[in-house]
Each structure stands twice: as structure tokens, then as C-alpha cells.
């Protein structure tokens, strides 16, 4: 139960904390869209598609707003809730713990253990004279 609660807390915090980091890495900064970034390419494509301007409410405009001003409190609560649910689900999955290593049987061959005698070196070197 504690593992699941810890995973939920980590998932919620990660979801809220990752948004500004990812947006900043894409180029949506507090000072505007960074030059030569993914955000600049997105803005250029949106402007070309709309005949020269970026329309209000578009994905680029929304991401620019979030990058400059941050998310609202309700958006942070929603992100934390979704992240907590995902974290709890992933923390409860059986694949998150390491499986027990199977024990080797005595009559099975083991890796990196010599099974017989090593090959014998040649008795003399053979040189071919011409």
C-alpha cells in the first residue's frame, strides 16, 4: 500500500513539474518563443497554414501562453490528479519489481565454466619456405 501511495505522489509531482521543463525545452519560454527552436518551427508552420498569422486558441498560441504565464491552478490540479492515478497504476504493477533469479540445476551446463579440457597448443610452428 505504501509503495502505491509513494508512486502516486511521485507521479503527481512529476506530471506538474514536467510541463514547464518540456515547454521550455521546446522553446516556449517566459520571454516568448526562442529562435531556431521547435516552437519557432511550429509557429512558422501555423502562420503559413493560416495565411500569415497564428490564430488565437490554436495549439501554438496555447503553448506560448502556458510557457509565458504557466498553468492555472485548476490545470495543475488536473495534471496532478492524472499523474497520481498513472503513478499508482504503474507502482502497483507486478513488472515494477525485479523477478527472482531462477536457480541453476547441478546437471545443467553453467556459462563461463570450462566443461572439458582446453585445446592443446601446437607442438611446433610450421613455416612454408619457397
Swiss-Prot record:
Induction: Not up-regulated by type-I interferon. The keyword tRNA processing does not apply. One of its GO terms (biological process) is apoptotic process. It is a multi-pass membrane protein. Its main location: mitochondrion. InterPro entries: IFI6/IFI27-like (IPR009311), IFI6/IFI27-like_sf (IPR038213). It comes from the Eukaryota. Keywords: Apoptosis, Membrane, Mitochondrion, Transmembrane, Transmembrane helix. GO terms for molecular function: molecular adaptor activity. Residues 93-130 are annotated as: Disordered. The chain crosses the membrane at residues 8-28, 43-63, 66-86. One of its GO terms (cellular component) is mitochondrial membrane. It is found in: Mitochondrion membrane. Plays a role in the apoptotic process and has a pro-apoptotic activity. Belongs to the IFI6/IFI27 family. This is Interferon alpha-inducible protein 27-like protein 2. It comes from Homo sapiens (Human). The gene is IFI27L2.
Amino acid at each position: 500500500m505504501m509503495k502505491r501511495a509513494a508512486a502516486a505522489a511521485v507521479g503527481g509531482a512529476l506530471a506538474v513539474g514536467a510541463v514547464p521543463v518540456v515547454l521550455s525545452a521546446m522553446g516556449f519560454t517566459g520571454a516568448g518563443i526562442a529562435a531556431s527552436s521547435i516552437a519557432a518551427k511550429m509557429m512558422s508552420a501555423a502562420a503559413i497554414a493560416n495565411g500569415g498569422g497564428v490564430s488565437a486558441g490554436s495549439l501554438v498560441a496555447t503553448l506560448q501562453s502556458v510557457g509565458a504565464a504557466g498553468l492555472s491552478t485548476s490545470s495543475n490540479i488536473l495534471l496532478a490528479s492524472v499523474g497520481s492515478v498513472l503513478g499508482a497504476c504503474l507502482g502497483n504493477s507486478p513488472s515494477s519489481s525485479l523477478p527472482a533469479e531462477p536457480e541453476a540445476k547441478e546437471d545443467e551446463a553453467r556459462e563461463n565454466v570450462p566443461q572439458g579440457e582446453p585445446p592443446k597448443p601446437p607442438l611446433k610452428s610450421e613455416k612454408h619456405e619457397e
